[in-house]
């Protein structure tokens, strides 16, 4: 939330957070305290219904277990209107490994959740989990680890087509690392049923916590404002590239995230 709220706000959209948990620090740190809010989510939703609350957009991110995924589906079904823009970031794993929260039940509930969305933002690992589950994800990951850059990009395009067909959504597959002529790049693939679009930039540094949250927040606010997905992805890539560069220059620990605050003003649509 500390990444999402400032991004959504500076883009001119009011953020109304429904916490699933309050943490002392993100889960990449060796020690953290987590106060689970699952049993209080219904109370908050009930109060919002009394207010006749109907958001213009709904964005779901990290969910700690299958019960929270159920609550997220319930939230969408309670508050979504015909014109409500829904984005789901199906947080389950990265780099061919599931996160500790992962269970097959969570994955099945996440499949239900993404069917409520207009746009989803999985990385390759999460795309494979949505399509195949844990066992086949690992098999596929071993296979793609041997691919050249061109083979990997072709494979991701196939996965993107499968996602859009199976879940009837627009899928943005994020954080695809590859090499071309000795240079390192990171790409994002926008997958619609009729077309696919690549947005690519040179890669700098390693993996930083919170970049996926920032990326999805820019897309979700853009959806509410009627911005084309490709334009929002390019905006997110430009923003993240600058924050990552500063984090590398300053030697910021990956668990601290990137240095994005300086560039928040660039997300605002100044009139």
Where are these regions (language model features)?
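Short beta-strands and strand-loop turn motifs
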Residues: 57-61, 87-95, 121-129, 173-174, ...
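Short, small-residue alpha-helix embedded
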Residues: 206-229, 233
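Short pre-catalytic strand/loop immediately N-terminal to key active-site residues, enriched for Gly-Thr
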Residues: 196-210
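Conserved phosphate/ATP/ADP-binding segment of small-molecule kinases
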Residues: 101-197
């Amino acid at each position: 939330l500390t990444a999402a709220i400032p991004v959504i706000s500076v883009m001119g959209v009011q953020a109304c957070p429904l916490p699933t948990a309050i943490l002392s620090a993100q889960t990449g740190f060796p020690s953290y305290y987590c106060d689970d809010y699952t049993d209080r989510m219904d109370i908050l939703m009930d109060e919002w219904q009394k207010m006749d609350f109907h958001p213009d957009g709904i964005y779901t991110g990290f969910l700690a277990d299958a019960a929270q995924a159920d609550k997220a589906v319930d939230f969408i079904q309670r508050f979504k209107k015909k014109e409500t823009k829904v984005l789901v970031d199906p947080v389950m794993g990265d780099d061919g490994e599931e996160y500790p929260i992962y269970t097959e039940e969570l994955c099945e509930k996440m499949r239900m959740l993404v069917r409520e969305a207009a746009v989803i933002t999985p990385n390759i690992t999460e795309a494979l989990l949505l399509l195949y589950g844990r066992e086949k994800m690992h098999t596929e990951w071993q296979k793609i680890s041997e691919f050249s850059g061109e083979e990997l990009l072709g494979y991701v395009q196939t996965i993107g087509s499968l996602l859009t067909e199976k879940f009837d959504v627009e899928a943005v597959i994020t954080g695809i690392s590859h090499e071309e002529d000795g240079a390192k790049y990171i790409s994002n693939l926008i997958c619609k049923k009729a077309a696919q679009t690549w947005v690519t930039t040179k890669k700098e540094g390693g993996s930083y916590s919170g970049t996926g949250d920032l990326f999805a927040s820019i897309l979700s606010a853009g959806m509410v404002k009627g911005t084309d997905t490709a334009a929002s992805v390019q905006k997110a890539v430009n923003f993240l590239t600058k924050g990552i560069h500063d984090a590398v220059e300053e030697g910021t620990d990956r668990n601290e995230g990137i240095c994005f605050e300086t560039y928040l003003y660039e997300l605002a649509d100044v009139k």
